[in-house]
Amino acid sequence: KTTWMKRFNTSVNVAPSFLDKHLNFNFTAKYMFEKDRYAKVGDAIGNALSMDPTQPVYGNGEDYKYVGGYFQYLQNKSDQISDPDWKKMAASQVTQNPVAVLDNYKCIAKSNDISGNLEVDYKIHGFEDLHLHAAIGAQYTDGKQDETISKYSYSNNYFGYYGYDHAYKYSIEGKAFAEYAHQFGVHDIDIMAGAEQSHYHRTGYN
């Protein structure tokens, strides 16, 4: 009832050639967005299996306003609640209303993922056995999550709860090399020399 997932993807690829196909490019980029809503599915199922089926989803009476109008077995408020106008709360050690378990919890997560890669290959004019090749790739991922528990819930009655998490990470990798390949009769020679470097970073907070 309160879980879903939405996703959007797109990508592009371009591979042009120049100078009589001696200079070749290959560019690829991808983007993905995802949005999810999570629920306390296990808690809801467990309570649904043990809930008295003769009880209504919503309660009748003034006291049920302290639990959002849902039917719950009630008890007097705890000593931690000093508000004189708040008199009742959901009883502990008893089955909770499974609909209230779902409706009183909201967790929304969003993520963005962007990646790209560019490759360049140059075949030397007049000396086509020698190739110069370079490539660079990068990826960036950003994720956020908001968690809200209603003040009418069993777990956080009166006080409620709000939590926030945000994390992002990125990586960059690059390489460049020269390659010489030639066949001498029945013999092949292939020589390559180059360098490669990468960088990774991650940050998160709540």
Locations of the language-model features?
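Surface-exposed interaction regions that form or flank ligand-binding interfaces
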Residues: 130
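Surface-exposed loop/interface segments of Gram-negative outer-membrane beta-barrel transport/assembly proteins
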Residues: 15-115, 133-206
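Transmembrane beta-barrel architecture of outer membranes
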Residues: 5-11
